[in-house]
Amino acid sequence: HICGYAHTNAGTGAKSEIGDAAYGGSVENDNSGTLRYIRLEYTGYAFSEEKEANGVSFYGVGNGTTVEYLQAYKGSDDGFEFFGGSVNVKYLVATDCSDDSFDWTEGWNGYGQFLVAYQGDKATIGYDCDCLIEADNNGKNAAATPVSAPVLANMTLVGNSSTANKRGIRL
């Protein structure tokens, strides 16, 4: 996971789900580096409902960070999860992730463009995804500010036959 110094609505002393790394602050243009042209295969693990390792977890990452051309492939939890921050992302692909393809919480308000989520059939991938998108503000305080409000454009979401009577997007 990547921990930055941009905003989060989780309060001071926010800690990552894995490793208890500190994150968050008030540096909206926080630069946590460049991630470009990366394929993450078979990553992640759900230790418990509150302790999950995703394909990539962005904790309070700012908009000075470059995130482009990433694929989360057959991960054991979410493909990409955003915990607050203002990071902008382009060209992300989540393929056959066991939980959500894209997930955000704690006030993420970045931009996402050219995003693709694809879920194969349960018989093929061995599990059933929860949602293509799961979006919330703060699990402990729905009115926490800043409110999650990302701007998304040019998305393609492809479910499968085993999710026909489930939620593709959970807001």
Role assignments for model-derived ranges:
Residues 1-171:
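Beta-strand/loop edge motif enriched in small/polar residues
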